[in-house]
């Protein structure tokens, strides 16, 4: 690193005096505190000369400050001609830079030594001390502004471009928390804003404050005043009698120091001006003091020159005197050259031009202006800013010469300047985790990136990401990592009380907690879920429940917050994207820690019933067992499970009749439904996960929800709208986790849902038979592999491989008998008596719910009889045309005869015609006993009969939710709004069952909220009003956890969230519905890392109740859409796949159905091949990953150390540009006491091509690296099982893919063919020694590989400094080999055969050997110094 300022100056002895003054005035710290600086340092000689000339004793501090520019590191190339910069002395003291004859100057001092770098700045050497130039008198005004009101402990920031003062004001602020507004006394910062008004000192003018004209230090020669100031022109306004550019002379005809005396010469030349005395030199022919007397007599008798006058002195003596403008003795006169001496009194920047004898005119030279006596350089900057950009400074550099330099924060040539985008340098001062957005107003806006929060200057990520950044909380983070507590990586919000790192050293119980597996509970006890509690929130909160389940108390003493009355909050409000961190001074200890017995691999040993009995849930456990549900819950197709257990106390508190119902064996089916509602399948949910989802589907089929507590229940969890409270958390058993609750869950639709579980098989991805790819997400391996074709390498296509057969379990929504439609409404007549037991309900999972009535019945609920039928059984009864039947369900079947007719059916005339007096009503019948009886549906005395008002009697037989109306004797019933039916039986209309999701978005759930009413709610990971739903930004990159389950040597990319059903999802063009051609559809799926779904894949989704009324493309140009229930609006009541068939015109416009069974995209890194979930390196790396091949590996590495051919062989295994096939003997076929020659080893590699197992044809030969050939043969056993051999060695495992070839495992090593006899090698002793070391190293390698790899699945692991046994093999001339061997070995695939090591570690005696090599200086962290090898 570069030295500091003082250190660098110490290395420059010629500049030591200036360094001494910096120390004397203590300026180094002030200079070094700036982000950057530039110092102009005069050498020792220059300082000594300056002090001597000024007769001073030392340099003043102001002079040193005048040599320093802060905030910029100005290299020589940055010092532009005409540029100005403020100095450390103040903004009014500027340095100017000029380039003259290729020499760079600062002010008037040449820069002779440049670009001496320091850690933060640069030094330039000078040959002259800079004299302070004070030509600016800028005004520095300040105004006081107030910041925002906030907590006094965390002062609110001042507004932009202001600085805080020490003084603060008391203020009041409020916080709305948990439904209540709290008021606090806070502090408001006083901030100062500095406003600089540029101004020139008196006597200076223009933008750069140049000096006004004048002689010496006198402005306008002291004879006038200057038009000065920033906007001044520098023109002198002369006083009375004065004239000239600098008021340096008198007006014509005036003389004297005040130019107030007038000349009186009439015919002569006056001695005028400030230095004149007013005397007259007379012209030819005139004489006298005023030259007003004409000479008429020549007293000199013609002896005078023609340009002379003959004058008489007082004595009367005549003499000749040259006239004005001439000089001589009078007899000889010559014209005076006024320009002859001192340029005629003109300026040195003027030309003196003779006019008449003795006279001249002064004309300023080109580039200058003035009266000739005073000539000033023309400043082009004063007119039109010298042609410079308005954001540039124009600096005069010579007569009528100027340069343009863009102002700070601007760039360009000065003629055109544009704002510098500050965001391009150091991200504009924004956080590295922020976007810097540049505005045209020379401002930048810092905005934190997604997944970060803050003001843009400081941006923080998740709590899990922020904890390790702070040393005081890093130990808490490492404990979270070590004990797999990953909740804080989730979306939150959380409140974390992070103990100081040092507090872990002061807690003696940590060791016991760790050994008993309790540490994760202790760590969770420091986290409150569901709420982000800032310091002000804590001050008004008394307790909060932690993720561990126990509460912590919160108290305030002397304005300090304490947790559990013991841990002090040291720092607070470290806000992150998913919550807030408060640092506390000690570790918190929960009171109730649950010990969970586990085996050596960390698996929970106790089953559900044991754990339930241990924690007070025996009654619910017994119900599960008695109902036969235990085997269902523990079935592998459902595990892992999350169970909500009502306590024994909660079940005992149920009403007796409900307890009788639960424990009655006759109600086992209903009991199962209750119990299933307490189980979530295929999920082992953490407490923090439960509130994140809007709902959780239960094993019973209905949904339940978990919500966070409100009010005083901070951190508490409740089920189903706070019906049940969580009282125990994280009760682990062998196949899941349980949560204790304080009540039995009751669902409004309970009894109506009878979901079924459908399983079907899907093929997994095709890959190597050794490392067969995992099953897709949400599916499980069935334990069966199928042959398939795949493309493992970029240089090879269509290789036979294997794929897992994977089982997908679908929970199929289904209604119980007597219920129908998606929400399982009861059939007409009720679930217990559907269709009143007089018909069959079209129930289960259909939207119909219609009753198919038995013969004789009709009506919505089969509640009516056919015409002519009566009674509960609607039996037929026939009255003649002369009678009226009392029919219907409640009718008696009796026939009421007309007058004159009788008998049961009114088909017999009466013997005597009845006569009634008075006459009967027209609505009555005169009976045989001469009595009037009102007809059916009428009432009265027979004489007067009125129609019965049936609507007043039991609503006329109509349903309660129907309107009864009557016209005459006819009653009509009509269901009210929101209901449907015949009026006698009405059922609720479910708008969600219209076939088009109730008008909700396809990514929304339609929920019936009442008869004919519904609500649209966007699904998880979508936002909107339900009618329109857009994907929300995922709260967390799924690649951040365990690399998204990708291989360590793969790159993980989080895919855009899609609402999939068994991998199928629907895509629509941004342009709207049905805007995709077949080709565009394929592109749209590809952008989502998906493929176009096949017909079978869409069928699987339909089985999983995927219903979407929108047709889309399928593979092969087919178009279809799925329906799961009959609807006239969607598919014309077709249930299944509505198939439009394969389209001949692929340019038709449809939507598309895509297929993707993964959430992340895994891609093997450069130099690796695979599907991303499994990645293979080069042949050597793959060889190193197999513990069963370590003996051959040892031979290869020893060969590489022994000869150049060995190094070449190793290079073949690591060079990705060279491909080959490697046959490797397993350890059992190559015991440690046997060895291979170099030729033998080369005989195992074919470097001509890559030969897969199916490429090995019976009777063919393969050429090896040695140049020899290998014979391929086949054989079959009695069961016709084929075995392939290479030179008689059976191939045991094959097609193990590497990035540069393929590997086959064989039973025994191959032996190279013999060669001609060779001379014995010399150096036998040395060879033996090397052999001993190599053999022992090989044994060590085998042991190490077994020990290392038996504990974990394969994957390239970095060698540990303390544990690596390989580094002794790494000394090689090939950088590629060293690089390869220093890489981590590949992780062994879980489905690889078990490893049987040839020897065990326990029987080894170890010793230490010195390393032969290392992994290079760039791999020091992986390098070892010693290696242990067995004797």
Curated annotation (Swiss-Prot):
The chain crosses the membrane at residues 1323-1343. Residues 1-1322 are extracellular. Glycosylated. GO terms for biological process: cell adhesion; defense response to bacterium; defense response to Gram-positive bacterium; endocytosis; hyaluronan catabolic process; receptor-mediated endocytosis. Residues 207-272, 822-887 form the Laminin EGF-like domain. Keywords: Cell membrane, Cytoplasm, Disulfide bond, EGF-like domain, Endocytosis, Glycoprotein, Hyaluronic acid, Laminin EGF-like domain, Membrane, Receptor, Repeat, Transmembrane, Transmembrane helix. Gene3D superfamilies: FAS1 domain, Laminin, Mannose-Binding Protein A, subunit A, Tie2 ligand-binding domain superfamily. One of its GO terms (molecular function) is cargo receptor activity. It is found in: Cytoplasm; Cell membrane. Glycans are attached at residues 112, 140, 231, 243, 301, 329, 437, 607, 858, 929, 1145, 1161, 1233, 1249, 1258. InterPro entries: C-type_lectin-like/link_sf, CTDL_fold, EGF-like_Ca-bd_dom, EGF-like_dom, EGF_dom, FAS1_dom_sf, FAS1_domain, Growth_fac_rcpt_cys_sf. It is a single-pass type I membrane protein. Initially expressed in all vascular cells, including those of sinusoidal-like structures, vitellin veins, and hepatic veins or sinus venosus, in E13.5 fetal liver. The expression then progressively disappears in the portal and hepatic veins, but the expression in sinusoidals endothelial cells (SECs) is retained and becomes stronger during development. Residues 1368-1378 are annotated as: Interaction with TMSB4X. Residues 1063-1156 form the Link domain. The keyword Transmembrane helix applies. The keyword Protease does not apply. Residues 296-334, 335-376, 377-418, 419-460, 947-987, 988-1030 form the EGF-like domain. Interacts with GULP1, heparin, alpha-M/beta-2 integrin (ITGAM and ITGB2), and thymosin beta 4 (TMSB4X). This is Stabilin-2. The gene is Stab2.
